Every structure is written in structure tokens, then in C-alpha cells.
């Protein structure tokens, strides 16, 4: 009987060495799925002295992979009723440990982490946090092969053009 228990223990230990959670593999697959253009809505919610307040805008993200875990891209947030009111910025991104980190090239904007997200070939939704504000940002996007970036990117500088890159914003998105 003792030999049977020893054999079972050795078999279980052997099986455990062959099973593992490959976080790197999952991150690579998420980065591969993320590549392309995603369009939808971004919602910001916060509490002010009158209660819950917020705003909702159309948004589009473009993700280009440079390595297995990340790359570069750009984002535009705009008012669907007035597309000339928009915010456009380029960024670097990386998938690490199940989160997506976005670092905006414009240093006036803080980096964000996308967490608690759901991503498949057709839909991408989740939450963003910059670590500073009490604002809750939720987004819901669909994969979009036909989005026309021309309106927003024609006046944009190329990524890495200078250390003084600034986002482009007009109308209600312009900083005062």
C-alpha cells in the first residue's frame, strides 16, 4: 500500500510540472487580437457635489504591433454631432500581466491602464484608469476595418518626430 501512495504522489507531482499558467502566451495572444482599428463609445463618470455626472463620446483606437507584446497607435475622441470637436493623440502600448498600458506621447496626458476588459476578434470593452482622478472611464468598442482616419490624421505629426509632441484638440476638447 505504501508503494501505491508513493507512486500516486510521484505521478501527481509529475503532472503538476507539466501544467502551468503561461501569462506571456496570453499577453501575446491579447496583443495579436488588439491589432487594428476599434470604434465605439467612451464614457467618463465621476461624482460631483450634485451626484453622479459624466459624458459620453465616440472614440476610435488604432493599435499597430511592433513586437509580440505591444507597439504604437493613436486615439481620437469626438462628438458624433460635431466631428470637428475632437481630441487626437498618438501613444505606445503594451500588454503585460493581463493589463494594457497606454503611454501617450503628449506629456500633458497621463498614462492609462486598461483593466477588467473583454477582448475577442469583434468586441473590446473594459475600464481605464490613470491612477490620479476619481473618474471612472468605461469603453465599448467594435472592430472596424473601414474606419477613415484621414480627417484626424492628415494634420498630425509623425510619431517620435520630436520630444515636444502635443495632442491635437478642437472645440469642446481643447484645453483652456
Enumerate the predicted regions with their spans.
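N-terminal leader/targeting signatures
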Residues: 3, 14, 57-59, 120, ...
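N-terminal glycine/threonine-rich, aromatic-flanked beta-hairpin/loop signature
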Residues: 49-101, 105
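Small side chains
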Residues: 9, 36, 40, 71-73, ...
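Beta-sheet ligand-binding and adhesion/scaffold domains
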Residues: 98-176
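Bacterial Sec-dependent N-terminal signal peptides
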Residues: 3, 14-41, 164-176
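Bacterial N-terminal signal peptides that target proteins for export
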Residues: 1-8
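Surface-exposed or flexible loop/turn and strand-edge residues in extracellular/cell-surface modules
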Residues: 16-18, 35, 58, 97, ...
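Tryptophan-anchored aromatic micro-motifs
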Residues: 30-56, 91
